[in-house]
Design a protein with these regions (language model features):
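Membrane-interface catalytic loops of GT-C/OST-like multi-pass glycosylation enzymes that act
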Residues: 91-92, 149, 153-158, 203-208, ...
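Membrane-embedded alpha-helical segments of multi-pass membrane proteins
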Residues: 36-55, 98-109, 160-169, 210-217, ...
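Hydrophobic transmembrane alpha-helices and their immediate junctions
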Residues: 221, 228, 328-369
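A membrane-periplasm/extracellular boundary helix in multi-pass inner-membrane enzymes
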Residues: 198, 202, 223-263, 275-283, ...
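Transmembrane alpha-helices of multi-pass inner-membrane enzymes
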Residues: 21, 44-50, 174, 337, ...
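Alpha-helical transmembrane segments of multi-pass inner-membrane proteins
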Residues: 26-28, 106-107, 119-148, 153-224, ...
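Long extracytoplasmic/lumenal interhelical loops at the membrane interface
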Residues: 261-275, 287-326
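Transmembrane signal-anchor hairpin modules in multi-pass inner-membrane enzymes, especially those
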Residues: 1-92, 96, 114-126, 175-187, ...
């Protein structure tokens, strides 16, 4: 049976499956540690994928869930791309769309089309947990020992890492709490959970604390009501974390400004950019000002309010940025994409209690819906690649889960 599965891999040698898994794994795991290496690995994987697609009669081997989700994402992409119709810089918008939208989504396509073996998926996840943990620990070192204003991890904006933390924290907790996962991956999930919590403190981000707190009830309620012992352990951990926060004036002061919309400059300026985005939408309601054109219109077309003092480069919101850039058409596509991602996964979770559906739901809710409220996460390269990987991972692993039984490895 194993040999039959190997031969069936796009009518080529089974070695290609291993090579694809290695390349995709490098591309995902090194997206923050070594961006250039990550990009090269994904480019080679994409070229190899084109060869395998051609070798397989110009067909991709996709399960129904992956095929359906790709269609939904493409509908959102097309609705957003309509914004190119009446812009002056069509070439620039087209290049941005290919580079920042299509290219990043290739991570999802590569995983669902070319990594079917459970062991390969879990090995990639294991390496990801390890590198992610180093990223978080570096952020702690930067914040606590080097006394940086905020820890950033390997590189980039600190918000990149905090957005990823929100996803990984929920995913790690679900893997640990669910009885079906193997002990080996649970060990690395524990590493991911501890590192995520440390990263929350090291990155010193208000949004990450808020998002993590809002998402936690979705997975804690189900697991804790079925285990008094686990409920007691989690309660103790939460009390310790709460005590650590409350005992530190620095964290209390920082978190107390989360909802301050009157005197906190960061929050106030965000609101002014949202007002500017609304003005852009009112002037270009159908298909917006064009993808990635928000910054030019904000600086040069009179939309910036004098009250906004930081000269922010974007609208600090998935919703307001895309409303301004893609208009009603693109925003409707965004809402359909959000609705499908949340409703379908949550329905499946309620019906089957499949932990992979819950991971899908919490990852999307964390990054795109909640974190995206105050940061345009769809623009963040490393964040999007990790999100697409986690969503693809859940779809692929779901095929090997049988409710009420232990996992069965795919051959």
């Amino acid at each position: 049976m194993k040999n039959e599965a190997n031969i069936a891999f796009y009518n080529t040698s089974p070695k290609y499956e291993i090579l694809m898994a290695v390349l995709i794994g490098i591309g995902i795991c090194l997206t923050r540690l070594a961006t250039a290496v990550s990009q090269i690995a994904l480019a080679i994987a994409t070229i190899l994928a084109a060869y395998l697609w051609w070798k397989n009669g110009k067909r991709l081997n996709l399960n129904d869930a992956a095929r359906q989700y790709i269609k939904v994402v493409c509908m959102w992409f097309i609705a957003s791309f309509v914004s190119i119709i009446d812009v002056d810089n069509k070439a620039v918008v087209f290049y941005y769309f290919l580079g920042d939208w299509i290219w990043r989504f290739m991570v999802f396509v590569l995983v669902v089309a070319f990594i079917n073996r459970r062991e390969y998926l879990l090995k990639i996840l294991t390496v990801f947990f390890c590198i992610f943990s180093i990223d978080c620990l570096i952020a702690c070192y930067q914040f606590f020992l080097l006394h940086w204003e905020r820890g950033r991890g390997f590189h980039g904006d600190y918000l990149d890492l905090t957005a990823i933390i929100c996803m990984v924290l929920a995913m790690s907790a679900i893997i640990l709490l669910d009885s079906h996962f193997e002990k080996n991956i649970k060990k690395f999930a524990l590493l991911g959970l501890v590192s995520s919590i440390a990263g929350l403190f090291g990155c010193f981000g208000r949004g990450a604390f808020l998002v993590s707190a809002l998402v936690a009830p979705f997975y804690l309620y189900y697991y804790l009501r079925n285990s008094k012992k686990m409920a007691a352990i989690i309660l103790i951990i939460l009390c310790l974390l709460g005590g650590a926060v409350l005992s530190s004036p620095k964290y209390v002061e920082r978190l107390s400004t989360t909802l301050n919309t009157t005197t906190n400059r960061s929050n106030v300026d965000r609101i002014w950019t949202w007002k500017a985005s609304w003005d852009m939408f009112k002037d270009h309601p159908v298909n917006g000002v064009g993808l990635n054109n928000w910054g030019w219109y904000y600086r040069n077309a009179g939309y910036k309010y004098d009250e906004e003092k930081q000269n922010l480069p974007h609208a600090h919101s998935n919703y307001m940025q895309l409303l301004a850039e893609t208009g009603i058409i693109g925003f409707f596509g965004l809402l359909c994409f959000y609705g499908f991602s949340l409703i379908i996964s949550f329905r499946r979770w309620i019906k089957h209690h499949n932990p992979l559906d819950l991971i899908f739901f919490t990852a999307f809710l964390s990054v795109m819906v909640l974190f995206g409220f105050f940061q345009p996460t769809y623009r963040l390269s490393s964040v999007l690649r990790v999100l697409w990987f986690i969503l693809a991972l859940t779809i692929q692993l779901r095929e090997s889960i049988f409710i009420g039984e232990k996992y069965e490895k795919q051959l």
